[in-house]
C-alpha cells in the first residue's frame, strides 16, 4: 500500500448543540482550507459516545452532511425512548472523522468496521446501531485497511480506554465470532436461504430444524452469528416476536 495516503482528520467536541454550532461557525472556519473542504463537503464518519456506570455506550454513523445529521440526532433527543436522549443526560463526546479519499462506499465500510471493533471492546457495553451495510467493489477499496488503521490509531490517541489496540480487538473471541464480518458469496447465499426458510416457517406456523454442516475452519460460526443477527434485525423491523436458540454439534476432536 502506498505510503502517501494522508492522515485522517479527527475532531473531538462536546456532544451538544451549542458546541456543534461553535465548531461550525468559529472553530472550523479557523482551520486550513483543506480541512474545511473535507468536513463541509465530503462524507464523514462520526461516533457519539458517553459513559454510563463506568462503561461506554456508542453510536457510529456516517453522513454527507455532518452538521445536519447531528442536529437531527439532537432533535430526536427529546424522545426519552430513543438512544439520543442519553446525549442530554450524560457528558457525551462526539468524534467527527474525515479523509480526502472518503466517498459514500468507503465511509460505509469504515462505519461498519468501527461498529465491528466497538462491539469487541471490553469497556463498551452497548453499540446502539448494529445494522451493517458492507460494500463490494469500489474505488478506493484497496485503501480501506490502511485508512482505517490510521483512523483507529488517531482515535486511540484521544481515548485509550474506548479505543484499545487493534491487536487486542482482533484477539478477542467476540471479534472472531462477530456477525459483522463480511461474508463470502457462499456464506451470504446460505444465510439468505436460511432466513427465507425461517420466515416461511413462522408465517405458516410450522416448526423446522436447520442444520449447517461443514469442516473446521469453513466459517460456520461467523455464518451462524450473522444469520441470527440478521434474523433479529429483520424481526425487529417488522415488529415480529422472535426467540432464538442455537444448538451447536461438533464432530471435531
State each model region's role.
Residues 1-68, 72, 105:
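GIY-YIG nuclease catalytic motif and its immediate N-terminal context
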Residues 66-113:
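Conserved short loop/helix modules at catalytic or binding sites
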Residues 108, 113-168:
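Interdomain "pre-motor" coupling segment immediately N-terminal to P-loop NTPase/helicase cores
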Residues 165-185:
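Conserved adenine-nucleotide phosphate-binding loops and their immediately adjacent elements
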Residues 179-208:
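N-terminal pre-P-loop "Q-motif" helix
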Residues 212-214:
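Hydrophobic anchor at the beta1->P-loop junction of P-loop NTPases
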Residues 220:
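Conserved lysine of the Walker
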Residues 223, 227:
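Hydrophobic positions on the alpha1 helix immediately C-terminal to the Walker A/P-loop
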Amino acid at each position: 500500500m502506498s505510503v502517501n495516503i494522508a492522515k485522517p482528520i479527527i475532531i473531538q467536541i462536546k456532544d451538544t448543540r451549542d458546541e456543534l454550532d461553535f465548531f461550525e461557525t468559529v472553530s472550523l472556519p479557523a482551520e486550513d482550507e483543506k480541512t474545511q473542504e473535507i468536513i463541509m463537503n465530503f462524507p464523514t464518519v462520526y461516533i457519539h459516545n458517553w459513559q454510563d456506570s463506568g462503561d461506554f455506550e456508542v453510536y457510529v454513523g456516517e453522513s454527507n452532511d455532518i452538521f445536519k445529521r447531528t442536529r437531527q440526532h439532537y432533535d430526536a433527543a427529546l424522545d426519552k425512548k430513543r438512544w439520543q436522549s442519553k446525549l442530554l443526560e450524560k457528558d457525551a463526546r462526539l468524534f467527527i472523522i474525515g479523509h480526502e479519499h472518503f466517498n459514500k462506499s468507503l465511509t460505509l465500510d469504515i462505519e461498519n468496521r468501527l461498529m465491528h471493533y466497538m462491539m469487541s471492546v471490553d469497556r463498551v457495553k452497548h453499540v446502539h446501531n448494529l445494522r451493517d451495510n458492507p460494500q463490494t467493489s469500489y474505488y478506493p477499496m484497496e485503501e480501506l485497511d490502511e485508512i482505517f488503521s490510521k483512523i483507529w490509531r488517531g482515535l486511540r490517541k484521544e481515548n485509550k480506554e474506548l479505543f484499545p489496540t487493534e491487536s487486542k480487538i482482533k484477539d478477542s473471541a467476540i471479534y472472531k465470532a462477530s456477525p459483522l464480518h463480511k461474508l463470502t458469496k457462499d456464506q451470504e447465499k446460505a444465510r439468505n436461504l436460511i432466513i427465507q426458510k425461517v420466515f416461511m416457517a413462522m408465517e405458516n406456523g410450522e416448526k423446522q430444524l436447520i442444520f449447517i454442516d461443514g469442516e473446521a475452519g469453513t466459517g460456520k460460526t461467523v455464518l451462524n452469528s450473522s444469520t441470527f443477527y440478521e434474523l433479529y434485525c429483520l424481526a425487529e423491523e417488522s415488529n415480529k416476536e422472535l426467540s432464538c436458540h442455537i444448538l451447536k454439534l461438533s464432530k471435531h476432536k
